[in-house]
Amino acid sequence: MEFPEHGVRLLGRLRQQRELGFLCDCTVLVGDARFPAHRAVLAACSVYFHLFYRDQPASSRDTVRLNGDIVTVPAFSRLLDFMYEGRLDLHNLPVEDVLAAASYLHMYDIVKVCKGRLRKKDPDLETRTLGTELPGQPPHPLPSWSPAFCQAAPKAKHPSLGVKATHPLPTFGPPSWQVAEQSSGALDLSLKPSPRPEQVHPPCRLQTSLCSSVQQVAQPLVKAEQDSFSEQDSSSPQSADRSPPPVCASAAQGLAVDLEPLHIEGTGSQQLGLPAEPVLDSEELGPSRHLCICPLCCKLFPSTHALQLHLSAHFRERDSVRARLSPEGSVPTCPLCSKTFSCTYTLKRHERTHSGEKPYTCVQCGKSFQYSHNLSRHAVVHTREKPHACRWCERRFTQSGDLYRHVRKFHYGLVKPLLV
């Protein structure tokens, strides 16, 4: 026999007990305000209180002090009423304050509701954020994938890129790279691709043209690549026949895309001996995503994660060519500081600290870096994506260092028990 109203009556009686101060066994302090409450209710509704009462000794559980810089008194009062009533009142209260307090207390249902309210309140907020230009970035981002743009695009094929839509549409289901990201354990808030439209629009070709300014920038870039490879032993036939990858325009005007998978032929990963990349599908990209372009070979990717994997393959191949051991009987030694190294490649990396050489250049903004991993991290700046997610409050960050500082500042009390 079930009593559907039992939960409502139980919450009502607990609310009456809190208002009367009856059986309240703890006090929450927010600034100068005091809120008597029941530990069981707080721990049942908030992960923060659950961990606090689980880890704190019994002698220090009577009073809980919250960070007044993050949790305001009105916001916590509304959240406390929600715990006892099951109803959230956002009238005459900034949603941002409730969102900050709910994130601090790890009340994830409230966090999702507040974020949805903010998106409805200002739907163009995300668009304006993406439209803000960063210093040194091209003024026009790559156009997004859309059927209307695809219909209006010219169906010509650029001979230098060799882009052809030759594969059939794949079956339904999430792409493999998304499944790999979801299985990593981090909470993913990135936009998922929208469902496939019922009517597929006619295919069109991908077409770009090289800007003269980019061609001018490409000259020293190609020369730098040739110089870096010429430093190796000329006896190797592979390094002698190797040619640098082409450089394409960063802001491709008149970019037309296909709703079918795209396959890029010609020079690129095949010449470098890199593993074959998965074919891009419109379902993987989604209508609201921008393309990610490899700064070394101009290959297109649907996400920053896929681009970084591709860049790591680039650098592994380049490092394997450069990291040949020196001839027998000689130890690689720096001529400036006499420091010795295990192989020639590590010596060349060390020499950059003396010369200031920056061989890794981003073709989108022209910024150069001394090491390959710095260029890989920099590529995220142009895509505006935030792949690093906080597992406790759902905030996302562009760089892993920003996530680390956020966790140390706001969630150190939660991380410390996990490290013991």
UniProtKB/Swiss-Prot annotation:
UniProt domain BTB: residue ranges: 24-92
Biased composition regions of type Low complexity, renumbered to the chain: 227-241
Start and end residues, zinc fingers (C2H2-type): 292-314, 332-354, 360-382, 388-411
Cysteine-cysteine disulfides: none
GO CC field: cytoplasm; nucleoplasm; nucleus; plasma membrane
Main location: cytoplasm
Family annotation (SUPFAM superfamilies): beta-beta-alpha zinc fingers (SSF57667), POZ domain (SSF54695)
Tissues expressed in: Highly expressed in skeletal muscle and ovary (at protein level). Low expression in brain, lung, spleen, liver and heart (at protein level). Not detected in kidney and intestines (at protein level). Also observed in testis and, at lower levels, in stomach and nervous system.
Coiled coil: none
Alphabetically ordered keywords of this record: Cytoplasm, DNA-binding, Metal-binding, Nucleus, Repeat, Repressor, Transcription, Transcription regulation, Zinc, Zinc-finger
MF annotations from Gene Ontology: DNA binding; zinc ion binding
InterPro entries: BTB/POZ_dom (IPR000210), SKP1/BTB/POZ_sf (IPR011333), Znf_C2H2_sf (IPR036236), Znf_C2H2_type (IPR013087)
Source organism, top-level taxon: Eukaryota
Protein function: Transcriptional repressor. Specifically binds DNA and probably acts by recruiting chromatin remodeling multiprotein complexes.
Stated family: Belongs to the krueppel C2H2-type zinc-finger protein family. ZBTB18 subfamily.
Stated name of the protein: Zinc finger and BTB domain-containing protein 42
Organism ancestry: Eukaryota, Metazoa, Chordata, Craniata, Vertebrata
